[in-house]
Structures are given as C-alpha cells and as structure tokens.
C-alpha cells in the first residue's frame, strides 16, 4: 500500500479531522501527528507513520 495524502480540515481539542485526497474522512489523535500540524496542513501516512508533506 502506497502513501495516503490528507488535508487537515479542523482541530477539535486533541483530535484532527482530515480528508484524504480520495475523499475519505478520518479523525486522528494529535499526539500521533507531527509537531507543527495545523488546519490546512498536508500530511502523508505511510507505513503507519505520519509526516508533513
């Protein structure tokens, strides 16, 4: 499985709400995401790790 790209739509307390490029919505705990993640950030999930794109 290749990388999946997401855009952070909103942050609600300890969770980021994001949408993948294919339109799938996801909610992820902020502590799992890279430092500096904000609304509008582009993230890549690959091999169970997150990084800023």
Each model region followed by its residue ranges:
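Glycine-centered tight beta-turn/hairpin loop motif at sheet-sheet or coil-to-beta transitions
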Residues: 1, 21-23
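Structural detector for short beta-strands of small beta-barrel domains
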Residues: 1-11
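Residue-level signal for tight coil/turn positions that link beta-strands
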Residues: 12-13, 47
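Short, Lys/Arg- and Gly-enriched loop/turn segments at beta-strand edges
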Residues: 47-53
């Amino acid at each position: 499985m290749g990388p999946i790209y997401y855009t952070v739509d909103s942050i609600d307390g300890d969770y980021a709400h994001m949408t993948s490029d294919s339109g799938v919505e996801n909610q992820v705990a902020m502590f799992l995401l890279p430092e500096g993640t904000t609304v509008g950030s582009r993230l890549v999930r690959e091999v169970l790790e997150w990084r800023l794109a």
